[in-house]
Design a protein with these regions (language model features):
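Sec-dependent N-terminal signal peptides
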Residues: 4-13
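A domain-level signal for the mature, folded cores of soluble proteins
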Residues: 18-123, 133-222
Length: 222
């Protein structure tokens, strides 16, 4: 996981058809480059809970630990500059904002992950206006689940919706607060916390990540 940030983008929401917006720089893509002037503020605080190196083998260790350790949490603050922080399998990062995110027209904030076009790093996204009650964006993947995608395969952007990491590297994946249901415990005009939760890329039902209509992300990340 690399960066999360806030921006103001006056655009229509994504249409939810059979497939979703394509890769960055393709016609119809919703990806926003890290240098876009649409970004107006960045996360200012972070708490990370590291996940397993390999959730299917919790006894696997490196350097005496079965949890990931690459990068420091502070690498995820401010504008993307290259350094990252690893979350590991089902790891989480909760970011805070001195300037709350509000529900404007179109997309309201974006999340950066450090995957590449051939290796997407995917995550669920949740938001909170009080730091206690979190609400998850409904995510959907149309990725096939018959065969486990191998180490050099990856889900494809047109089959992914509301998953951080849909776009690789220098491009943020945008989110629209209007897609969340109304709730008395969520003030969409005062979002102070955004939580990123690693998606385990496995079709084994013991470890697979499921959410919304169907989220079955088929890439095993060791």
């Amino acid at each position: 996981m690399n960066k999360i940030l806030l921006f103001a983008l006056l655009a229509a929401s994504v249409s939810h058809g059979q497939t979703y917006p394509p890769e960055a720089e393709s016609p119809g893509s919703t990806a926003v480059h890290k240098d876009s002037p649409l970004y107006v503020a960045w996360a200012t605080g972070i708490t990370v809970e590291r996940g397993y190196l390999n959730i299917s083998n919790p006894d696997f260790m490196i350097g005496g630990s079965n949890r990931v350790s690459s990068g420091t949490p502070e690498n995820a603050l401010g504008a993307p500059t290259g350094p990252t922080v690893s979350l590991g399998d089902r790891g989480t990062a909760t970011l805070t904002f001195a300037r709350p995110i509000s529900n404007g027209e179109g997309f309201d904030f974006a999340v950066f992950e450090n995957g590449g076009p051939g290796f997407l790093e995917l995550a669920f996204v949740e938001v909170s206006s009080d730091g206690t009650h979190f609400f998850r964006f409904p995510a959907h993947s149309q990725t096939q689940t018959d065969t486990q995608i191998g180490s050099f395969g990856s889900p494809s952007a047109p089959y992914l919706n509301n998953l951080a990491g849909k776009y690789a590297g220098s491009y943020g994946t945008p989110f629209d607060l209007s897609e969340l249901p109304n709730d008395a415990q969520l003030n969409k005009n005062n979002i102070t916390h955004v939580r990123i939760i690693d998606v385990v890329g496995a079709i084994d039902p013991l470890y697979a990540s499921y959410e919304g209509v169907v989220v079955r992300l088929c890439k095993r990340r060791n």
